[in-house]
Amino acid sequence: MAYELPELPYAYDALEPHIDKETMTIHHTKHHNTYVTNLNKAVEGNTALANKSVEELVADLDSVPENIRTAVRNNGGGHANHKLFWTLLSPNGGGEPTGALAEEINSVFGSFDKFKEQFAAAAAGRFGSGWAWLVVNNGKLEITSTPNQDSPLSEGKTPILGLDVWEHAYYLNYQNRRPDYISAFWNVVNWDEVARLYSEAK
């Protein structure tokens, strides 16, 4: 069973002006697509691996043969991370979470604004390429970041919100202004989906 590039749940220009059409098009059809292509090449002929979901694959890298483990870690992580990322964005996004997720964010971080500050710091402080994450770890919310395309799933954590801070995610529009990109991100967060993922993970 080959891994496939998922369709976006919105048009490439739907997130403008916060994330521009050209960036979304290249990010999805080139970068994400390359991860899918290279993941399929890596697991080709290995039925046991190819039958796993990409999430199962990156959650158990120890079961991947050593000669392809790095390729699966990088490209499987890239596929899993982006597959999730697209669902966390929405042209109708922004605002604040509500319900149980909002209560837990306030409990753990002090307030929604303090959460945003800590998440933004994790995103801005990630040296080079990587991701910032809000994860559920043993039932508790925490902020973390990963290098390259490493997935929190590989650490036994469940990501419910992620921000891609590779330069390809923002450079066409924001150049070296990563903090501006991070600020714009809050305008397109799909909090309904984040809340759904939280309820499943806790």
UniProtKB/Swiss-Prot annotation:
**Which family is this sequence assigned to?**
Belongs to the iron/manganese superoxide dismutase family.
PANTHER family in the cross-refs: 37S RIBOSOMAL PROTEIN S26, MITOCHONDRIAL (PTHR43595), SMALL RIBOSOMAL SUBUNIT PROTEIN MS42 (PTHR43595:SF2)
The record's annotation in SUPFAM superfamilies points to: Fe,Mn superoxide dismutase (SOD), C-terminal domain, Fe,Mn superoxide dismutase (SOD), N-terminal domain
Which residues does the record give as Mn(2+) binding sites?
A: H27, H82, D164, H168
Q: What does this protein do?
A: Destroys superoxide anion radicals which are normally produced within the cells and which are toxic to biological systems.
Describe how expression is induced or repressed: By heat shock, salt stress, oxidative stress, glucose limitation and oxygen limitation.
Assembly mode: Homodimer.
Q: Can you say where in the cell this protein is located? A: Cytoplasm; Secreted
What domain of life does the UniProt record list for this protein's source?
Bacteria
Q: What broad class describes the main subcellular location of this protein?
A: cytoplasm
A GO cellular component annotated for this chain's UniProt record is: cytoplasm
Its GO biological process annotations read: removal of superoxide radicals
Query: What are the UniProt keywords, alphabetically?
Result: Cytoplasm, Manganese, Metal-binding, Oxidoreductase, Phosphoprotein, Secreted, Stress response
Q: Which cofactor does it need?
A: Mn(2+)
What is this enzyme's catalytic activity, as reactions? Answer: 2 superoxide + 2 H(+) = H2O2 + O2
Query: EC number(s) of the enzyme?
Result: 1.15.1.1
Which positions bear Phosphothreonine? T34, T70
> GO terms for molecular function, please?
metal ion binding; superoxide dismutase activity
Q: Which Gene3D superfamilies match?
A: Fe,Mn superoxide dismutase (SOD) domain, Iron/manganese superoxide dismutase, C-terminal domain
Instruction: Relay the cofactor remark from the entry.
Output: Binds 1 Mn(2+) ion per subunit.
Q: Enzyme class, one word?
A: oxidoreductase
Q: What is this protein called?
A: Superoxide dismutase [Mn]
A matching Pfam family: Sod_Fe_C
